[in-house]
Amino acid sequence: MSLFDGKKVIIIGDRDGIPGPAIAECLKGTAAEVVYSATECFVUTAAGAMDLENQNRVKGFADQFGAENLVVLVGAAEAESAGLAAETVTAGDPTFAGPLAGVQLGLRVFHAVEPEFKDAVDSAVYDEQIGMMEMVLDVDSIIAEMKSIREQFGKFND
Protein backbone atom coordinates (compact mmCIF):
# COMPACT_ATOMS: atom_id res chain seq x y z
CA MET A 1 0.00 0.00 0.00
CA SER A 2 1.36 3.37 -1.04
CA LEU A 3 1.45 6.49 1.06
CA PHE A 4 -0.73 8.05 -1.64
CA ASP A 5 -3.47 5.43 -2.04
CA GLY A 6 -6.79 7.23 -1.92
CA LYS A 7 -5.17 10.48 -0.79
CA LYS A 8 -5.65 14.05 -1.98
CA VAL A 9 -2.29 15.77 -2.36
CA ILE A 10 -1.40 19.41 -1.82
CA ILE A 11 1.95 20.44 -3.30
CA ILE A 12 3.81 23.50 -2.07
CA GLY A 13 6.92 23.67 -4.23
CA ASP A 14 9.77 26.17 -3.95
CA ARG A 15 11.25 28.34 -6.68
CA ASP A 16 14.72 27.88 -5.17
CA GLY A 17 14.18 24.23 -4.26
CA ILE A 18 11.88 21.74 -5.94
CA PRO A 19 9.04 23.34 -7.92
CA GLY A 20 5.45 22.12 -7.76
CA PRO A 21 5.32 20.79 -11.36
CA ALA A 22 8.37 18.53 -10.74
CA ILE A 23 6.71 17.00 -7.67
CA ALA A 24 3.41 16.62 -9.55
CA GLU A 25 5.15 14.87 -12.45
CA CYS A 26 6.58 12.30 -10.03
CA LEU A 27 3.09 11.56 -8.70
CA LYS A 28 1.60 10.72 -12.11
CA GLY A 29 2.34 7.01 -11.71
CA THR A 30 0.75 6.79 -8.26
CA ALA A 31 -2.80 6.63 -6.91
CA ALA A 32 -2.49 10.22 -5.64
CA GLU A 33 -4.93 12.90 -6.71
CA VAL A 34 -3.24 16.30 -6.79
CA VAL A 35 -5.87 18.83 -5.70
CA TYR A 36 -3.53 21.84 -5.55
CA SER A 37 -0.02 22.67 -6.66
CA ALA A 38 1.88 25.92 -6.22
CA THR A 39 5.47 27.04 -6.47
CA GLU A 40 6.42 29.70 -3.96
CA CYS A 41 9.48 31.67 -3.04
CA PHE A 42 9.95 30.60 0.58
CA VAL A 43 12.64 33.22 1.24
CA UNK A 44 10.30 35.90 -0.14
CA THR A 45 7.51 35.31 2.36
CA ALA A 46 7.64 36.75 5.87
CA ALA A 47 10.36 34.88 7.77
CA GLY A 48 9.88 31.86 5.51
CA ALA A 49 6.33 31.33 6.76
CA MET A 50 3.73 29.66 4.56
CA ASP A 51 1.90 32.08 2.29
CA LEU A 52 -1.54 33.09 3.65
CA GLU A 53 -3.30 32.03 0.44
CA ASN A 54 -1.76 28.56 0.67
CA GLN A 55 -2.76 28.31 4.33
CA ASN A 56 -6.32 29.17 3.34
CA ARG A 57 -6.31 26.50 0.63
CA VAL A 58 -4.91 23.85 2.98
CA LYS A 59 -7.57 24.69 5.56
CA GLY A 60 -10.28 24.55 2.89
CA PHE A 61 -9.13 21.16 1.60
CA ALA A 62 -8.96 19.79 5.15
CA ASP A 63 -12.56 20.92 5.68
CA GLN A 64 -13.65 19.55 2.29
CA PHE A 65 -11.87 16.18 2.24
CA GLY A 66 -10.99 15.56 5.90
CA ALA A 67 -7.47 15.90 7.32
CA GLU A 68 -7.05 12.11 7.34
CA ASN A 69 -7.35 12.07 3.53
CA LEU A 70 -4.69 14.68 2.78
CA VAL A 71 -0.94 14.55 2.19
CA VAL A 72 1.09 17.76 1.87
CA LEU A 73 4.32 17.67 -0.12
CA VAL A 74 6.85 20.48 0.12
CA GLY A 75 9.89 21.29 -1.97
CA ALA A 76 11.61 23.93 0.17
CA ALA A 77 15.30 24.50 -0.50
CA GLU A 78 16.26 24.63 3.18
CA ALA A 79 15.43 22.50 6.21
CA GLU A 80 14.22 25.51 8.20
CA SER A 81 11.73 26.57 5.51
CA ALA A 82 10.54 22.99 5.08
CA GLY A 83 10.09 22.72 8.83
CA LEU A 84 8.06 25.93 8.99
CA ALA A 85 5.75 24.69 6.24
CA ALA A 86 5.43 21.30 7.95
CA GLU A 87 4.74 22.91 11.32
CA THR A 88 2.08 25.12 9.76
CA VAL A 89 0.08 22.17 8.35
CA THR A 90 0.48 20.07 11.49
CA ALA A 91 0.54 22.34 14.57
CA GLY A 92 -0.77 25.59 13.07
CA ASP A 93 0.81 28.78 11.78
CA PRO A 94 3.78 29.52 14.08
CA THR A 95 3.61 33.22 13.10
CA PHE A 96 -0.04 33.42 14.20
CA ALA A 97 -0.72 35.54 11.11
CA GLY A 98 -2.62 33.21 8.81
CA PRO A 99 -5.79 31.14 8.60
CA LEU A 100 -4.02 28.17 10.25
CA ALA A 101 -3.06 30.13 13.39
CA GLY A 102 -4.04 27.88 16.29
CA VAL A 103 -5.44 25.23 13.91
CA GLN A 104 -3.83 21.85 14.59
CA LEU A 105 -4.58 19.79 11.48
CA GLY A 106 -1.82 17.23 12.11
CA LEU A 107 -1.59 16.52 8.36
CA ARG A 108 0.77 14.02 6.77
CA VAL A 109 3.57 16.14 5.37
CA PHE A 110 6.70 15.12 3.52
CA HIS A 111 9.50 16.76 1.58
CA ALA A 112 10.12 15.61 -1.97
CA VAL A 113 13.64 14.38 -1.07
CA GLU A 114 12.45 12.13 1.78
CA PRO A 115 12.54 8.36 1.27
CA GLU A 116 8.78 8.11 1.95
CA PHE A 117 8.17 10.14 -1.21
CA LYS A 118 11.13 8.94 -3.25
CA ASP A 119 10.32 5.25 -2.70
CA ALA A 120 6.65 5.74 -3.63
CA VAL A 121 7.28 7.20 -7.09
CA ASP A 122 8.91 5.98 -10.30
CA SER A 123 12.68 6.22 -9.83
CA ALA A 124 13.39 7.27 -13.44
CA VAL A 125 10.87 10.12 -13.23
CA TYR A 126 12.23 11.13 -9.82
CA ASP A 127 15.81 11.22 -11.13
CA GLU A 128 14.72 13.29 -14.13
CA GLN A 129 12.59 15.77 -12.17
CA ILE A 130 14.30 16.02 -8.77
CA GLY A 131 17.66 14.23 -8.96
CA MET A 132 19.74 17.32 -9.75
CA MET A 133 18.24 19.34 -6.88
CA GLU A 134 18.72 16.43 -4.51
CA MET A 135 22.47 16.73 -5.11
CA VAL A 136 22.61 20.37 -4.00
CA LEU A 137 20.12 20.35 -1.11
CA ASP A 138 21.10 19.39 2.43
CA VAL A 139 18.96 16.25 2.30
CA ASP A 140 19.97 14.92 5.74
CA SER A 141 18.99 18.17 7.46
CA ILE A 142 15.69 18.33 5.58
CA ILE A 143 14.84 14.72 6.49
CA ALA A 144 15.72 15.28 10.16
CA GLU A 145 13.62 18.46 10.35
CA MET A 146 10.59 16.91 8.64
CA LYS A 147 10.76 13.78 10.78
CA SER A 148 10.97 15.87 13.94
CA ILE A 149 7.89 17.91 13.00
CA ARG A 150 5.89 14.78 12.13
CA GLU A 151 6.85 13.11 15.41
CA GLN A 152 5.89 16.19 17.44
CA PHE A 153 2.71 17.28 15.70
CA GLY A 154 1.53 14.67 13.18
CA LYS A 155 -1.80 12.99 13.89
CA PHE A 156 -1.58 10.42 11.10
CA ASN A 157 1.59 8.36 11.50
CA ASP A 158 0.87 5.48 9.15
UniProtKB/Swiss-Prot annotation:
Keyword Oxidoreductase attached: yes
GO molecular function term, any single one: betaine reductase activity
Catalytic function, reaction form: acetyl phosphate + [thioredoxin]-disulfide + NH4(+) + H2O = [thioredoxin]-dithiol + glycine + phosphate + H(+); acetyl phosphate + methylamine + [thioredoxin]-disulfide + H2O = sarcosine + [thioredoxin]-dithiol + phosphate + H(+); acetyl phosphate + trimethylamine + [thioredoxin]-disulfide + H2O = glycine betaine + [thioredoxin]-dithiol + phosphate + H(+)
Known function: In the first step of glycine, betaine and sarcosine reductases, the substrate is bound to component PB via a Schiff base intermediate. Then the PB-activated substrate is nucleophilically attacked by the selenol anion of component PA to transform it to a carboxymethylated selenoether and the respective amine. By action of component PC, acetyl phosphate is formed, leaving component PA in its oxidized state. Finally component PA becomes reduced by the thioredoxin system to start a new catalytic cycle of reductive deamination.
Summary of subunit composition and partner proteins: Monomer. Component of the glycine, sarcosine and betaine reductase complexes, together with components B and C.
NCBIfam families in alphabetical order: reduct_selen_A
Active site: U44
Main enzyme class: oxidoreductase
Family: Belongs to the GrdA family.
Coiled coil, from the record: none
Keywords linked to the UniProt accession: Oxidoreductase, Selenocysteine
GO cellular component: glycine reductase complex
Descriptive protein name: Glycine/sarcosine/betaine reductase complex component A1
Cysteine disulfide partners in this protein: none
Enzyme Commission number(s) from the entry: 1.21.4.2, 1.21.4.3, 1.21.4.4
